[in-house]
């Protein structure tokens, strides 16, 4: 009954709609109803993404750089993509996890989407490097490491002493 309602809603995607999230057979069954499924924010290794792909459990793979163990593992996951699966990193972060996700996207798929929480921050730790422009784009910082240096004055101001 709910499948028809969801299809009529013309969702961009339905994210991790089944519990537990590693129920890849259940996700595959739901996906066959024509609903775009995004999954992977709770997966921790490339092996789980391989299983997700082999079960055709999602249209959109959403690895989280901090949950999968960093940049190397998320690159392995992004390189697994095949059969028209999209990779849209899950990034509900405001700090180094977000910057690491931007670097991965820039290295592998610069035209990729990124899932990001949007809130107006009281202070900008990264001097505007994580700001979204009027077209919804984010510039990828090109400095060393994660591409930027944090604003030390902001760190000092908001540090708990």
Give the location of each predicted region.
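Catalytic core of soluble alpha/beta enzymes
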Residues: 1-92
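Flexible C-terminal active-site loop/helix
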Residues: 92-161
């Amino acid at each position: 009954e709910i499948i028809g309602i969801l299809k009529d809603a013309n969702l961009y995607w339905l994210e991790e709609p089944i519990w537990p999230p590693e129920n890849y057979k259940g996700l595959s069954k739901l996906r066959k109803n024509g609903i775009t499924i995004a999954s992977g924010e709770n997966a921790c290794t490339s092996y789980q993404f391989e299983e997700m792909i082999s079960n055709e459990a999602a249209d959109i793979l959403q690895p989280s750089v901090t949950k999968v163990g960093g940049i190397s593992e998320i690159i392995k996951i992004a390189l697994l993509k095949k059969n028209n699966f999209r990779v849209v990193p899950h990034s509900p972060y405001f700090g180094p996890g977000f910057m690491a996700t931007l670097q991965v996207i820039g290295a592998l798929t610069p035209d990729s989407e990124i899932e990001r929480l949007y809130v107006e921050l009281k202070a900008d730790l990264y001097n505007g490097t994580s700001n979204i422009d009027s077209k919804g784009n984010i510039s990828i910082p090109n400095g060393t490491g994660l591409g930027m240096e944090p604003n030390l004055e902001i760190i000092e101001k908001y540090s708990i002493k």
